[in-house]
């Protein structure tokens, strides 16, 4: 997977953990499968822009913050 997908995944995990959320917590909030989120956080899946927007909203950050 691309470097940008890996960076996105690392950022999602970092922000999620900073906010005290487990992967399961985030997945329940987003109504998505935990295996999918695991793949996103590990850089193995590249989520759509719509999914990135949902993740940003669930984590209460901007899309820009996720992409840094």
Q: What are the roles of these predicted feature ranges?
A:
Residues 42, 61, 68:
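Short, conserved catalytic or interaction motifs in soluble domains
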Residues 10-29:
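Short basic helix-loop element that most often maps to the first helix and adjoining turn
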Residues 6, 17-18, 46:
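Short amphipathic helical patch at the helix-1/turn junction of helix-turn-helix
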Residues 50-65:
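DNA major-groove recognition helix of helix-turn-helix/homeodomain DNA-binding modules
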Residues 1-7:
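A detector for short, charged/polar N-terminal pre-domain segments
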Residues 32-46:
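Recognition helix of helix-turn-helix/homeodomain-like DNA-binding domains
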Residues 12, 26-27, 37-40, 66:
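Conserved hydrophobic/aromatic packing and binding residues within compact polymer-binding modules
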């Amino acid at each position: 997977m691309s470097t940008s997908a890996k960076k996105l995944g690392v950022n999602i995990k970092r922000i999620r953990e900073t906010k005290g959320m487990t992967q399961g917590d985030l997945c329940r909030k987003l109504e998505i499968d935990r295996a999918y989120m695991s793949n996103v956080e590990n850089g193995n899946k590249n989520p759509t822009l719509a999914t990135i927007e949902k993740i940003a909203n669930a984590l209460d950050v901007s899309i820009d913050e996720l992409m840094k």
